[in-house]
Amino acid sequence: MPKELVYMNNQIDFYFDIISPFSFIAHKKIQKIIQNKKVFFNYKPILLGGLHKLAEIDAPAFNKYKIKILQSDCELVSEKNNISFIWNSKFPINSLYMMRGYLYVEENLKEL
């Protein structure tokens, strides 16, 4: 029998890159968590590519060997968690414009 999750704080900051397949899977898992628990997730968008540049590292998504593992991991985790998932064949893509759109909607159209 699985243990009951206990949260010390009812608010959790969730940092995500808007185009990340891992962020998508995590978002779906979060939706299941908030249905059953009294916990609130603060979505905090980040540009993961910018963090890679800042740390002066190559993103795994641009490594032809690592991208296969990333795809396999996403498919495995989504299947295990019963999450419908299809790998975006155009991944990785530049998320800057999508992020700007997200921030605009978040700031100006809060009623959505």
Please describe what each predicted stretch is.
Residues I18, F24-L112:
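Structural alpha/beta surface segment adjacent to cysteine/selenocysteine redox centers
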Residues M8-D13:
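Extreme N-terminal starter segment of soluble prokaryotic enzymes
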Residues M1-Y7:
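N-terminal amphipathic/basic-hydrophobic helices that include classical n-h-c signal peptides
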